[in-house]
Amino acid sequence: MYPAHLLVLLAVCVSLLGAASIPARPLNLYQFGNMIQCANHGRRPTWHYMDYGCYCGKGGSGTPVDELDRCCQTHDDCYGEAEKLPACNYMMSGPYYNTYSYECNDGELTCKDNNDECKAFICNCDRTAAICFARTPYNDANWNINTKTSC
């Protein structure tokens, strides 16, 4: 083998090792964000819901601070139920990694019939949460709170 070929092979191996250490990201987070934007007609950016109260964002504990935070708690619970479904219980098929089919028409969200059992369940979790977000007041004081003292 030529030295140049060895260098290319080494570079590819190093790149693959680096890629293996990148944490997996939820694939349907983008879809959920689009559902939120559909339901609220783009009035509030999706990232405003990523660090709100005790349940909106990563994790969740304690008592929800308001109705919007309860929407997030319900969404977390819904994902927990999805993880118990046999159809959602195989590698990369759970609520955070499974994508689904849906439609948005003038703020109305519809989960499509071509979703399998797991995708349909997850889609309905996201749809219900997005509708809840759209109808519930947003309190700026509950964004980026100290969850250790407030939850």
UniProtKB/Swiss-Prot annotation:
The protein's name in its UniProt record: Acidic phospholipase A2 5
Give the annotated active site.
H75, D126
The record's function comment reads:
PLA2 catalyzes the calcium-dependent hydrolysis of the 2-acyl groups in 3-sn-phosphoglycerides.
Pfam families according to UniProt: Phospholip_A2_1 (PF00068)
The reaction(s) catalysed by this protein are:
a 1,2-diacyl-sn-glycero-3-phosphocholine + H2O = a 1-acyl-sn-glycero-3-phosphocholine + a fatty acid + H(+)
Residues annotated for Ca(2+) binding in this entry = Y55, G57, G59, D76
Annotated S-S bridges:
C38-C104, C54-C151, C56-C72, C71-C132, C78-C125, C88-C118, C111-C123
Q: Which GO terms describe its molecular function?
A: calcium ion binding; calcium-dependent phospholipase A2 activity; phospholipid binding; signaling receptor binding; toxin activity
Record organism: Tropidechis carinatus
List the GO biological process terms.
arachidonate secretion; fatty acid biosynthetic process; lipid catabolic process; phospholipid metabolic process; positive regulation of fibroblast proliferation
Keyword Hydrolase belongs to the record: yes
Q: What is its EC number?
A: 3.1.1.4
Q: Where is the signal peptide, in residue numbers?
A: 1-27
Instruction: Determine the domain of life of the protein's source.
Output: Eukaryota
> Belongs to which family?
Belongs to the phospholipase A2 family. Group I subfamily. D49 sub-subfamily.
